[in-house]
Amino acid sequence: MVSAVGLVFGYQFGKNSTVRMASINIIVVITLSLSGFISGADIIIPKSPPEPWQTALMARYIMHSSDWVSIASISTQKDIIGYPFVSLKSLSDGPKTNSTGIPYLYMTDMDVSGHDLEVDSRVTIMATLAQSDYCRTQQYDPQDPRCAKVIITGKYIKVDKKTSEYTFGQTSLFDRHPAMKTWPTGHEFFVAKVDPVQIDVLDYFGGIKHVSKEDYFNANITVIINADVEFARVSVIEIIN
């Protein structure tokens, strides 16, 4: 028989610590990150994506989980000038231990899309969980809204080779795609990125949801899933006599 409802404050530390709290039938648990410190070796991309109501976090999850994107440019090819043209590009938004949300690409002006974007920098990219095992294990068709997609429309920018961002972007790409290190130097590959203007997510029934640029970059997936972050835990429990 339930005689009272208590509010218990406790602290839960990393995987090497233990919390002892006498409680039965936890009703609500709210977890908030306090420290923000990251132990990179312990960060793992969760197997299950965020809930549909966590739209910004879902966008970041898809981007960080993806190894490639579809990229749409405005064609400069003679017979289809002005038409949309789609190709596939390898992607990294940072090493596995550091999601930035910035889509970095390894591009060359010799490529059809690279030439298009040199003329008109407007671009749209799409990443989807259809490239992972998630949709397959859930038996979601790639077109099923629950097989989540993030669509980013923005400006294509060549990253300045003299900056630390260029080094970071290149390292991030090589970390995800080691074969890039051996691509022909004569093709003069370089690091580029997409600066978002509009961010859309389709992850459930009801249509596309818009995510503000601010919310997108504030939703840091790698901090949320870190196993060694110190947490404050507030639990509402039933106390049984």
Language model features with spans:
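Binding-site signature for planar aromatic cofactors or substrates
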Residues: 6, 10, 16, 20-241
